Amino acid sequence: MFSPRGTPGSGRRQAPRTGGRRSVSAVQPGLLFSPRRSAVTARSTPTRVQSHAVVESYNFDVQTFGSSLPVKVMEALTMADVDDQISVKVEASGWAWMVCGERLIVWKVSQTSVAKLSVCKDLQLPSSEFAYSADLVSISSSGPLDLAPIQSISVLAVSPDGLVRFWPSLAHEGSYTEISLDLSGHLSNYVAAVKGGSFIVSSYRGHLLRLSADSSGKLHHRPVQQGQGMLSGIGRRVSSLFGIRGQPADLSVFSVLWVKASSCLYSLSSCGLSKWEVDENSETQVLSWSTNQIITDSITDAIWDSESNYSEIKKGVNVLYLDMQPSNAGLVVLAAAWYPGDTPCVAYFCLVTLAESIVPSPDLLTVEVTKYNPPFQSEEELLKTRLVLPDPSSPAAYLYNEELVFACSTGAGRGGLAEEKILFSSPGDRVRGGGVCADLPVFFSQNSGLVAVLARETASLLPETMEDSLCTSVAGPGPEGTPLETPPKIDMVAQEDKTKLLKQAFLQFCRHDLVGAQSMVDELFPSDGEGSADLDTVVTQIDLDLVDDYPACDPRWAESVPDEGAGFTLTSLILLHQLEDKMKAHRCLMDFLLQTGLLDRLTSTKVRSCPMATRLLLCEHAEKLSAAIVLKNHHAKHPELVNTAIQTALKKNSTDTPTNLTPADVFFREVSQISSIFECLLDEEEKALKEHPDAARWGEVVLSVNDIIKDMLQAAAQYRETKASLYRAPENCSPEPEYIPWTASGGVGGVRSVISRQHELILRAAYPHADAELRSVLCEQLVALLDSLLSGYVAQLTSLRRGGQQERYDTLENEYTQKRSELLKPLLELGQHQWVAALAEKYCDFDILVQLCERTDNQSRLQQYMVKFADQNFADFLFRWYMEKGKRGKLLSQPMATHQQLASFLQAHDHLSWLHDIHVQDYQRAHRTLYNQANMETRYFSKKKTLLALSKLTALASDMPEPVHRRQLNDIVEQERFLLHQETLPKQLLEEKQLNPDSMPLLSPQNLISLYICDENRGANEYDFKKALDLLEYFEEENGIDVDALKREIFSKALKKDWKESWSSSDDNDDPLEAARDSTFVKILQKLIQERVSLQTYLPDIKDLLQEDELESLKSKPYFEFLLRANYEHYLKVQI
């Protein structure tokens, strides 16, 4: 199926059929498609088809239809002169008629095998100097023709020069009416019975007349109404937009068709396609569509687009329309095309399907180039070929002429027929006409009468030439180098060659011998696993042979096929057909593997130095076929670019092109290497960017390269996706190797590398120099390429997830994340927000999405992403992103709808969650968070102090129960009291110790004591020593610290300071109490008394105190001990 070109142009107008009596000349057999003869048992047939085989055919049974012919028919055939033109028409109603010279014989076909008394009338046609044909006769009835009695059936016949004879009732062959039509000197070519018992008569030059008879049997005629539909009268310029056109003077009509089901009349002419809706008394033209140039362009593309001189060929191609039939997909037009410059000049028969539409479009047209390609002789010979479509819902089609019937398909639906030419070549035999009867294709053989062609159940699933090639590869060339006509016996093939043996089993399967195929498979690869080690290699090789097959039956390849003949040969002259046949063969192979149980037994094969599941490698082959078909279609649109790239690819691979082949022939043969074109296309693009500074010149190359690579990769991905079930892994299979699709291959020439290179080329060399319109297209194309690259990573990661390879998965995921960011960030920087968003959303690049929303200040889009990607924790990612970027204000100012999500996130981030709690006025929760954080803070003094203060404030603002409230506040106050000891450290001391009040660490009670009583605290007074003593209460018994020793150390430090500063200067005769009155020690005692501390229990024993190291030097001074004991005793008595 081919998409048509949309570019209009001037078409070559075809000459009409000439009307003189013509002798029938034999059509030479086609070059390539001789039918194979094989004695294959035919299936059972309905009673209307006799079991007698008329001609031999490989895929079809050709058998007599119905009972024997009426005597008058056989008599007319026997008595016919050599110059008499004989033609037959068969209608679905069961009626048939034969024109033999100037005799018209009408009969009802009996569909039973037993001859019964049937209706048969012999009518005399008006004399004419021109030869009659069955197309100039039609029958009508007021009721259904298949049930109508003979009395109600009327017959109308028109001579080529316009003399009309009308029989009102077939029961009275001698009663008729005649009139003469004025056709302006032109010959008539078709008669069609339409509604209301009337008839349409057409001429080669476009005269359309409607004839009807009154009650007396008198004929009346008038021209068919032209352009009288609802769009008529609106002006020629406007009406052309809707497909309504005027009729030119030199119109040539090729076919006229009446479709009873829709009551529509169609005319195919040199002006295009016209359509009328017909009722009992009038007709309305509803369509006149210029199809000729579109059809010609589409056919030309389909056949010659790979030729290097395509533009020259296109100007000289001739297309001739031959016939037209209805189908559910639209009107099917039979056309023949030839190029006089070809050697040899071949006529290509094509089936063009025109889907109907109110406003027709070229997109509704498809072309199927059949494999019936005889040598071109003359237009007159081509016009002898007609078309039969037995079932409107099926693509099955039959072409026929006097020599043969060719089975094929319209290409407009699934299924179809095996293409085969069925020759009626016995002496004196000719095919005189045909039609459809009882839903079967029925043809009139001069020797055998009516025959039906039925597809055999044993017909091979493979394309015909692929079937022959398979036989050749199994058994080697036959005596004359031709393929074997039947599969060889197993003992004819070397037993050790499992590839050949499995090919033979495949061949048997394709010929519907499933039992024989299964038996051979079981013998080659028993289910117990013996011999299965080679299974993956053998299957892979067979499929590779299919996709890389040499078209050995193409005459141009005759001298270029390897001698061993181990491949599958193809015969099509058209590259696209070769690729399509390879795809059909691949699908047959997959069906064979599935039904014989081999598919589930496949394991893995080494590809590109890595193991891959064999079933996925088979899928890869089909993907490359899909990509090759796309590339072939692009070859027609960009011949110069693709041809140059192909030549470069062949040169890189050191592949020679034989003189009788084009580089395209050689390149498209080896489908498995189709991806080698990508690098070569980029080379051409880079060359264009360097050589042509003008964007108008290099822009076309860049866009074309993007389109080609994009469409090829998308075709491969689409096949992989739509056919995934065919290549699925069996249930409970062991873990498979990592899957690296060919569309994600790295390294030199790998698709991933190619796309990365193209990304860099476009953004560096093309985008900066392009205008706005070109930039938009470039970005759209680039995004499609990046989509392919990223989807390859996803496929890889998915395979690793299934295989349980966590370490490799993590490594690849990091690579994927980094690559994704590298590819998308430049587009984001260029402001291509729409395309960036599309990719980032598809591949969940949350970082890019957040950056995009931040750049555009689009908070609503962020909220949408939170909903869209809720199951992937987008909200957590966003909140974390805000934290990492220091955007805590934005984090804490989220809309109310996200408060719950934010609260959940902040549970793991207590340092921020309390702010959110305050924002939502949950003060109790905020207090709890701050209180816990304060208790856990052991590093920074100022932080702990701040947390305690905030915790106190939130506690005061909260509505917690009173007992809890009081307990929490008391604890906070107590902690603040302890912190006050550190906060009131002397400034001079802090500077001495190089401690910054804002960043100093949180000090322990022991550290604080040491600081207060250290020598560096030169200005220490009773308050400092009293704070040190107060800090002793923060030591718990379980800490293992000797509090009494610390107390002695504090007092000893105070005493040593006193001795140094004042006591040492006192006289022994001084009053000890007066001498110590201003000392630090005494002031400490006074403060303890003020605080009602029991000195008796609190003060350390004097003996223990004097043993302190700090007082070691004072032990030898009696006055010191005297002063100490005197003050001890005095203050103990004072407290009593």
From Swiss-Prot:
Domain of life: Eukaryota
Keyword Protein transport: yes
Gene Ontology cellular component annotations, sorted alphabetically: kinetochore; nuclear pore outer ring
Tissue specificity: Widely expressed in the embryo and in adult tissues. Higher expression is observed in the brain, testes, ovary, skin, and kidney.
Disordered: annotated segments: 1-26
A GO BP entry: protein import into nucleus
Keyword hit for Membrane: no
Key words, A-Z: Centromere, Chromosome, Kinetochore, mRNA transport, Nuclear pore complex, Nucleus, Protein transport, Translocation, Transport
InterPro entries: Nucleoporin_Nup133/Nup155_C (IPR007187), Nucleoporin_Nup133/Nup155_N (IPR014908), Nup133-like (IPR037624), WD40/YVTN_repeat-like_dom_sf (IPR015943)
Molecular function in Gene Ontology: structural constituent of nuclear pore
Subcellular location: Nucleus, Nuclear pore complex; Chromosome, Centromere, Kinetochore
Database matches in SUPFAM superfamilies: Nucleoporin domain
Effects seen without this gene: Morpholino knockdown of the protein results in anomalies of the head, brain and kidney. Morphant embryos show decreased head sizes, reduced axonal numbers in the forebrain and midbrain, and disorganization in the hindbrain. As for the renal tissues, morphants show underdeveloped glomeruli with hypoplastic capillary vessels, and abnormal podocytes.
Family classification: Belongs to the nucleoporin Nup133 family.
Function: Involved in poly(A)+ RNA transport. Involved in nephrogenesis.
Subunit field text: Forms part of the Nup160 subcomplex in the nuclear pore which is composed of NUP160, NUP133, NUP107 and Nup96. This complex plays a role in RNA export and in tethering Nup98 and NUP153 to the nucleus.
Protein name (record): Nuclear pore complex protein Nup133
Native organism: Danio rerio
